[in-house]
Amino acid sequence: MNMNQTTSPALSQVETAIRVPAGIFAKYNYYSVFDIVRQTRKQFINANMSWPGSRGGKTWDLAMGQAQYIRCMFRENQLTRRVRGTLQQTPDNGTNLSSSAVGGIQGQAERRPDLATLMVVNDAINQQIPTLLPTHFPHDQVELSLLNTDVSLEDIISESSIDWPWFLSNSLTGDNSNYAMELASRLSPEQQTLPTEPDNSTATDLTSFYQTNLGLKTADYTPFEALNTFARQLAITVPPGGTVDCGYSACQPAV
């Protein structure tokens, strides 16, 4: 603050914001926003009931905001100066580097010989594969929000919908009783189909199953023992040297 300046620039902005005459804070021995925030909000309001009146709380809030901003700027400048000082102490050996550095650069083909074999496609880059399949994003979000409460959707709806009798007793059923059981299962819609779908693991001809799910017309799993075939039909990539266990249990339909 200049010697001829009685009020700091930050405090002048507070005066403008609350629409009081310029320099009025100096008359009450407030020359900067830090003079105001040294007091608590309640202390400042009680000590200045006569002139800011109902604007005392707003005045203190504005002064605190200005003080926080000044403090952040001071810390940022201090950190910047320290970084610059550290960099100046670090010796620059750039002039000692070999003038033939360009000729010694290792080529990309030598550094990453695997790039030519990688399959860079949209699915491989952008497709998000959850760790638990099948997945249903809206259901996952609901379960995440209920994780810390240890309640199910059934519990919430049963407490808010008294017109549903099937929540009162297991012996009562209604048009939505199946819906109530689905809510209590904590399974997503796709997961609920797994225990109810027909079991065809004992069928002698699984051609339809493999053609529908893996896109290859075959009666058994043996073609998928080849890693390239298995990865291609599932549209996935396997890292160099990677393996996939495609035994009978992996490629057979689940029981």
Swiss-Prot record:
Coiled-coil-forming residues are none
InterPro entries linked to this entry: Insecticidal_toxin/plasmid_vir (IPR018003), Sal_SpvA (IPR003518)
Which superkingdom is the protein from? Bacteria
Keywords of this entry: Plasmid, Virulence
Pfam families on file: VRP1 (PF03538)
Q: Which family does it belong to?
A: Belongs to the SpvA family.
**NCBIfam families reported in the protein's UniProt record:** PRK15212.1 (NF011759)
Functional description taken from the UniProt entry: Not known. This protein is involved in the virulence of salmonellas.
What is the recorded name of this protein? Answer: 28.1 kDa virulence protein
Q: Which organism is it from?
A: Salmonella typhimurium
